[in-house]
Amino acid sequence: MAARLPACVVDCGTGYTKLGYAGNTEPQFIIPSCIAIKESAKVGDQAQRRLMKGVDDLDFHIGDEAIDKPTYATKWPIRHGIVEDWDLMERFMEQIIFKYLRAEPEDHYFLLTEPPLNTPENREYTAEIMFESFNVPGLYIAVQAVLALAASWTSRQVGERTLTGTVIDSGDGVTHVIPVAEGYVIGSCIKHIPIAGRDITYFIQQLLRDREVGIPPEQSLETAKAVKEKFSYVCPDLVKEFSKYDTDGAKWIKQYMGVNAVSKKEFSIDVGYERFLGPEIFFHPEFANPDFTQPISEVVDEVIQNCPIDVRRPLYKNIVLSGGSTMFRDFGRRLQRDVKRTVDARLKLSEELSGGRLKPKPIDVQVITHHMQRYAVWFGGSMLASTPEFYQVCHTKKDYEEIGPSICRHNPVFGVMS
């Protein structure tokens, strides 16, 4: 067989889309998942409108270019991980393939990712776009959580390659806690947490707004985002952390320098409590969202307790982090400590209730962090799409023409998965 061109791996998220070729360790492009379109006035001569429609369809921009176009309407076709506008999504994919990857879609197999609990109909829509609009030879739709588990094999903490584990996937728009057993997601036990990267940015923006007057209002969001990415970390104890800043501020308070976009003058702000209060909303969500008060460690514990009893220990032993919002320093350590406390308290209680007759075996809680965390889903896809099995499990154009889009409702597990 002639040497194949590598597969294209595309991971579409709420905030950013990661894309590149299989076999690489990092995505070639990371672009905002938005599209800017010309919204022409809907009044006027119908014939004129019909003429313009074809032109308007070609007049659009995606990614960073879309954000820089003030005269266009900027749309985000994906909300909370799920595609909401398929027409825009098709145009978005068109530019991804031709402008960014510069690929001829007929020559490359494609691995696309989907969020947990994606509907079978959505898989069919994806198949229709890929096979009919782009004429791809083969398509595989992978669940993001399974790819994140595969990516965690690069960690030194992982002894054996397993596809059983609890994935905490926290991106820009949503955080999911997803239990996976032998490569299959336990759908009924998934929980989502309405706190993610964007909420942390908004919370830091609010804190800075209350305290710092020097930030230009139109730049307050990007300043908050920069502060979050540059200075934020997770602390082990809130009270001690506050006292650290109060007693020795010079050591802990950082300076952020920015440039006013209008006057081009520099401005500087002090970054203090915001450094640890931002990511703290994972563990104390009530700081930012009064309607949701369950810390992430409790959600993880509840998810695992809802799972079948025979997979609970392996799920505790392999808690895998994925996505940009899990990148805060010491996030994994704090999560491991909090989950361990909850688990140990439960074991102690069961021992007390049995009057000391039951001696429960301790449960090993391990949170896996690794250097591929930020793009874990994309990297997992890149690894699996460069294996020979990938081409055997892909749905081909021939299958699609024979059976129809329903073939993409089911995508077999493969690799070390099986």
Curated annotation (Swiss-Prot):
Alphabetized InterPro entries for the sequence: Actin, Actin/actin-like_CS, ATPase_NBD
GO BP: Arp2/3 complex-mediated actin nucleation
MF-aspect GO terms: actin binding; ATP binding
Subcellular location: Cytoplasm, Cytoskeleton; Cell projection; Nucleus
PROSITE patterns: ACTINS_ACT_LIKE (PS01132)
CDD domains documented for this protein: ASKHA_NBD_Arp3-like
One GO CC annotation: Arp2/3 protein complex
Entry superkingdom: Eukaryota
Chief place where the protein resides: cytoplasm
A Pfam family matched in the record: Actin
Keywords for the protein's UniProt record, in alphabetical order: Actin-binding, ATP-binding, Cell projection, Cytoplasm, Cytoskeleton, Nucleotide-binding, Nucleus
Sequence similarity: Belongs to the actin family. ARP3 subfamily.
SUBUNIT field: Component of the Arp2/3 complex composed of actr2/arp2, actr3/arp3, arpc1 (arpc1a or arpc1b), arpc2, arpc3, arpc4 and arpc5.
Role according to the record: ATP-binding component of the Arp2/3 complex, a multiprotein complex that mediates actin polymerization upon stimulation by nucleation-promoting factor (NPF). The Arp2/3 complex mediates the formation of branched actin networks in the cytoplasm, providing the force for cell motility. Seems to contact the pointed end of the daughter actin filament. In addition to its role in the cytoplasmic cytoskeleton, the Arp2/3 complex also promotes actin polymerization in the nucleus, thereby regulating gene transcription and repair of damaged DNA.
Full protein name: Actin-related protein 3-A
Upper classification of the organism: Eukaryota, Metazoa, Chordata, Craniata, Vertebrata
Gene name per UniProt: actr3-a
